[in-house]
From Swiss-Prot:
A Gene Ontology cellular-component term: cytosol
PANTHER family attached to this UniProt entry: UPF0250 PROTEIN YBED
Protein name: UPF0250 protein ETA_23570
Pfam families: DUF493 (PF04359)
């Protein structure tokens, strides 16, 4: 039996994205810019470098109001050129 995200969440809810991308200075700004378009707010993303320093992970938590918002952000964050993965 498959369970999808919509069945697991009750909205509004706090939802954290972890975005992995190339270790470039603009990564955080690009992530926040995309999030601001769909969930305006004051964000302080947490940034962690990879062990070799080639990649950064950016964790950012939003107050999600509906499943479409969550899904749209997954898609748009993944479309950032220097992003390699979104969890």
């Amino acid at each position: 039996m498959k369970t999808n995200l919509k069945e697991l969440l009750e909205f509004p809810t706090s939802f954290t994205y972890k975005v992995m991308g190339l270790a470039q200075p603009e990564l955080v700004d690009q992530v926040v810019e995309v999030v601001q378009r769909h969930a305006p707010g004051d964000y302080s993303p947490e940034v962690k470098p990879s062990s070799k320093g080639n990649y950064h992970s950016v964790s950012i938590t939003i107050n999600a109001t509906h499943i479409e918002q969550v899904e749209t952000l997954y898609e748009e964050l993944g479309n950032i050129e220097i992003v390699r993965m979104v969890l």
